[in-house]
């Protein structure tokens, strides 16, 4: 059952973690590692990289879906509040939650901390965070950068600016 979960601190699926561990060699290594601090990012980092030292950046957390947290499309589809939100998810705010502009600003501020160093870094973050940052850096729409759990992008920066990307794992 597909749920809206952003702020909810739910675990990753055990079978997903096992698959990540089996494919760990497909992921890039770095000198620095970051997570959002939510359990599923902590578990994902450990499944791929083992017990590596890392920093938690709460600014990299997914959207707080407010009243929609842990609810499915089926539960929400006929409500006026949900219909109002999905009419423009890039600008509207979830009741008692956040809107995409707030989340993106929070995510960008956290990424500025990561980018302050020129050392390579791995950030284990959420799909919405990934899509929002990629849209900001490379243009396009949110769905151009959709990721499944355990996938993402390697982004190359020069002089603090994003210049290219490739999907990971390939």
Language-model regions, residue ranges each:
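Active-site-proximal alpha-helix that buttresses catalytic centers in soluble enzyme cores
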Residues: 1-52, 98
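Phosphate-handling substructures
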Residues: 10, 48-106
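Generic beta-sheet signal
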Residues: 31, 117-128
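General small-molecule cofactor/ligand-binding pocket signal
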Residues: 34, 55-57, 166
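Short beta-strand scaffold positions
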Residues: 35-36, 105, 124-125
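Short, active-site-adjacent cap segments at secondary-structure transitions
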Residues: 40-42, 62-63, 129-132
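Active-site signature of alpha/beta-hydrolase-fold catalytic machinery across serine-
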Residues: 47, 132-136
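Domain-level recognition of soluble alpha/beta enzyme cores
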Residues: 140-166
């Amino acid at each position: 059952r597909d749920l809206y979960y952003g702020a909810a601190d739910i675990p990753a699926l055990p079978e997903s973690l096992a698959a990540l561990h089996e494919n760990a060699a497909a992921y890039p290594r770095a000198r620095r590692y970051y997570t959002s601090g939510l359990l599923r990012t902590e578990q994902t980092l450990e499944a791929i990289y083992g017990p590596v030292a890392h920093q938690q950046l709460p600014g990299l957390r997914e959207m707080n879906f407010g009243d929609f947290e842990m609810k499915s499309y089926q539960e929400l589809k006929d409500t006026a509040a949900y219909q109002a939100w999905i009419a423009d998810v890039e600008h509207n705010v979830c009741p008692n939650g956040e809107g995409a502009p707030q989340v993106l600003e929070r995510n960008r501020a956290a990424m500025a901390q990561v980018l302050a160093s020129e050392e390579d870094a791995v950030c284990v973050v959420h799909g919405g965070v990934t899509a929002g940052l990629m849209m900001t850096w490379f243009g396009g729409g949110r769905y151009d950068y959709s990721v499944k759990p355990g996938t993402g992008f390697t982004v190359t920066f020069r002089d603090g600016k994003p210049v290219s990307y490739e999907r990971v794992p390939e």
